[in-house]
From Swiss-Prot:
Protein name: Probable cinnamyl alcohol dehydrogenase 5
Cofactors named for this entry: Zn(2+)
Keywords attached to this entry: Lignin biosynthesis, Metal-binding, NADP, Oxidoreductase, Zinc
Description of how the protein assembles with itself and partners: Homodimer.
Native source organism of the sequence: Oryza sativa subsp. japonica
Entry's family note: Belongs to the zinc-containing alcohol dehydrogenase family.
InterPro entries assigned: ADH-like_C, ADH-like_N, ADH_Zn_CS, CAD-like, GroES-like_sf, NAD(P)-bd_dom_sf, PKS_ER
Residues involved in Zn(2+) 2 binding: C96, C99, C102, C110
Record: residues binding NADP(+): 45, 163, 184-189, 207-212, 247, 271, 294-296
Length: 354
């Protein structure tokens, strides 16, 4: 089959302004799945990428790696999916399939990983993301949606969800007897709270915004709330947490936060501050604490979507039309969203382009 034309929304330069673009999707390979995109979440990474804040953008750039839709075609070797299946695609669309990382289901660490957008595909072309009408993906990187999982509220789990689920699983912060802190209550943080409660853990939200206390406790189900700028509250929480999932992308003092951990406690970074972080060695060494990082998750971690469906874990979203996407980006830059924008691709992309 010949390549297929698809509708997309692309940034042409570092202004980040998104406008219609007709893109080409590769012909369907024997191992490929073709997906009609119905929803795509807006991740903060999309904003960084379209504005070239990470200095690696290739324009035109079509962002989006929180994709949900339905299968319209499957290659002859595909065994897991058929037409009509509800599916999603996260941050990756392919890898080498043969390295140690791939063999362990850790494709996110494959030296040859191909990301969903702004990455070089195996044919040398640049990948385009989910702000588009359809996508062609190797079946290994397609996630089946359980019937109980709505596509719009489930789409953000393919990035935000896996980003917090994977380190909680890997670092043992998924045990009912443990106490986890969630630093930051945004797109990542609110999902981390929900997963931690699904694991049966005690959850404390740590935030610089006192106004989020009621939201955290009453709407999201956190057990406690600590204002990071309140010395009394921070002192009261000192040494109480087994781990902290740090979702904040701002540059903040790390030593007071490490003080909240018990001896042998772990802080896992999933947010990416623009500037280097100052690490206080004594705060780690004295109580045998660990500071670690985590980058999304491998395909083995997509069991996350089944656990989410079982426990009713979904993202809190604001569904928008494709013609609102630039306004949404402006609002996202100001943290003016509770908690994730999701573009209604299926119903609005065509109208926005025409």
């Amino acid at each position: 089959m010949a390549p297929t034309a698809a509708a997309g929304l692309a940034a042409r330069d570092a202004s980040g302004h998104l406008s219609p673009l007709t893109i080409s999707r590769r012909s369907t390979g024997d191992d490929d799945v073709v997906i009609k995109i119905l929803y795509c979440g807006i991740c903060h990474s999309d904003l960084h990428s379209i504005k070239n804040e990470w200095k690696n953008a290739t324009y035109p750039l079509v962002p989006g790696h929180e994709i949900a839709g339905v299968v319209t075609e499957a290659g002859k070797n595909v065994t897991k999916f058929k037409g009509g299946d509800k599916v999603g695609v996260g941050c990756m669309v392919n890898s080498c399939h043969s390295c140690d990382s791939c063999n362990q289901g850790l494709e996110n660490h494959c030296p040859g990983v191909i990301f969903t957008y702004n990455s070089v595909d195996k044919d040398g072309t640049v990948t385009y993301g989910g702000y588009s009408s359809m996508v062609v993906v190797h079946e290994r990187f397609v996630v089946r949606f359980p019937e109980a999982m709505p596509l719009d509220k489930g789409a953000p789990l393919l990035c935000a969800g896996i980003t917090v689920y994977s380190p909680m699983k890997y670092h043992g912060l998924n045990v009912p007897s443990k106490h986890v802190g969630v630093l930051g209550l945004g797109g990542l943080g609110h999902v981390a709270v929900k997963f931690a409660k699904a694991f049966g853990m005690t959850v404390t939200v740590i935030s610089s915004s006192p106004g989020k206390r009621q939201e955290a406790l009453e709407r999201l189900g956190a057990d406690a709330f600590v204002v990071s700028k309140n010395a009394d509250e921070m002192n009261a929480a000192t040494g109480t947490m087994d781990g902290i999932i740090n979702t904040v992308s701002a540059n903040i003092p790390i030593a007071p936060l490490l003080g909240l951990l018990k001896p042998n406690g772990k802080m896992i970074l999933v947010g990416l501050p623009e500037k280097p972080m100052e690490i206080p060695p004594f705060a780690l060494v004295a109580s045998n604490k660990t500071l670690a990082g985590s980058c999304i998750g491998g395909m083995a971690d997509t069991e996350m979507i089944d656990l989410a469906a079982k426990h009713g874990v979904t993202a809190e979203i604001e569904v928008i039309g494709a013609d609102y996407v630039n306004t949404a980006m402006e609002r996202l830059a100001k943290a003016d969203v509770r908690y994730r924008f999701v573009i209604d691709i299926g119903n609005t992309l065509k109208d926005a382009i025409e």
